[in-house]
Amino acid sequence: MAKRKNIIFYFSDQQRWDTVNETVTPNLMQLAKEGTLFENNFTCQPVCGPARACLQTGVYATQCGCYWNGIPLPESITPLAHYFNEAGYDTAYVGKWHLASDRLPGIGTHCEATPVPKEKQGEYRYWRAADVLEFTSHGYDGYIFDGDGNKLDFTGYRADCINDFALEYLESGREADKPFFLFISQLEPHHQNDHHHYEGYKETVNQYKDYPLPPDLTFLKGDYKEMYP
């Protein structure tokens, strides 16, 4: 029997296709060269939670019911990790989830900044995540949770720390005799919701301060020069 391939799904948040290039994202370009590259693909939902729901279920947002942010993934729908578990894979999720909390206050589950209940973790065996990562962290420093709800603090640039949690799984957290499916979900380059701007890596401010915007955004003045990082 042929050895089954390991799978790493590296997911960024609110990122345009034309921001992936050798200058800005050389490591993502390297992953694309060494991994599987889909050159003609599209998200079926422009909104954060619904787009994630589509990825985790394989169906449209109107089918799974997550058609807007703040609608938890229905427990009646079989999630992606279930099929990998059935196929003998070890499954892991690291980063932002955004599929467990209800939008309306006082109704349903609210775990935006608290542990995601086990039954709402999409059947991933290994869990290092927060439902709304921008509520538990800023560009630098914060916390996530393990699968049992234990708080895990981190210090440093958030994207780097999420990568470190993923590396920790690869080095010591996985079942070594199984192939693995690892879903890494970054918040970056999404803006920081509680003060409405993107917190970039401090060391890159001078490097990218005059980086040209995509042509269709040049007429929008915005405040990115003032608010980065």
Where are these regions (language model features)?
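Short alpha-helical segments and helix-capping/turn motifs at coil-helix boundaries
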Residues: 111-113, 163-172
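Catalytic-site neighborhoods of secreted/periplasmic enzymes
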Residues: 57-156, 192-206
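Aromatic-residue hotspot detector
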Residues: 38, 123-124, 180-181
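Phosphate/oxyanion-binding active-site loops and adjacent basic polyanion-contact surfaces
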Residues: 158-162
